[in-house]
């Protein structure tokens, strides 16, 4: 169950949005960035973005998170309506402390999957049930999801969300994230077309 906590206008370089904050049963706060009025609409463009302090905020080149976030906000800013659900699930759900431990193992040659497993952690422990609850809160009838991750789509469908299609996100690989993106494609099944 989720509870709306607050909302306010959010002017950005990508356009005017509204930010909503919700609290879930685990007392975790999540943000929903809304463009226009998607309530009760069909074919709503949606991005579900998991928190990434190193990429989103610090501009790390180890991942493509910031690219995906910026591309999504830019895309949504050109739409009549749409949503970005920002989930507090740092490091595919393992948290910031463990994510930095995993980075250390990656510095020694492990890929992102191997690093999590060496730490005794799940490869991906994210949960998208909160996102499904948000979509129900806004009475969204159907979505087009901006993602390369088929597990997100599967999870939403299993939660009863009508997913009409996928909007791919393209990132130009850098020397720092090429191995990471290749691993996401080969080991996690991400649909990354330019790797």
From Swiss-Prot:
Reactions it catalyzes: GTP + 4 H2O = 2,5-diamino-6-hydroxy-4-(5-phosphoribosylamino)-pyrimidine + formate + 2 phosphate + 3 H(+)
Pathway: Cofactor biosynthesis; riboflavin biosynthesis; 5-amino-6-(D-ribitylamino)uracil from GTP: step 1/4
Keywords for this protein: GTP-binding, Hydrolase, Metal-binding, Nucleotide-binding, Riboflavin biosynthesis, Zinc
Necessary cofactors: Zn(2+)
Source domain of life: Archaea
Active site (record annotation): 124, 126
Cofactor note: Binds 1 zinc ion per subunit.
Binding sites annotated in the UniProt record for Zn(2+): 52, 63, 65
Binding site residues for GTP: 47-51, 68, 90-92, 112, 147, 152
Transferase in keyword set: no
Pfam families per record: GTP_cyclohydro2
MF-aspect GO terms: 3,4-dihydroxy-2-butanone-4-phosphate synthase activity; GTP binding; GTP cyclohydrolase II activity; zinc ion binding
GO BP annotation list: riboflavin biosynthetic process
UniProt GO cellular component terms: cytosol
Annotated EC: 3.5.4.25
Protein's job: Catalyzes the conversion of GTP to 2,5-diamino-6-ribosylamino-4(3H)-pyrimidinone 5'-phosphate (DARP), formate and pyrophosphate.
HAMAP family, per the entry: RibA
Family note: Belongs to the GTP cyclohydrolase II family.
Stated name of the protein: GTP cyclohydrolase-2
Lineage: Archaea, Methanobacteriati, Thermoplasmatota, Thermoplasmata, Thermoplasmatales
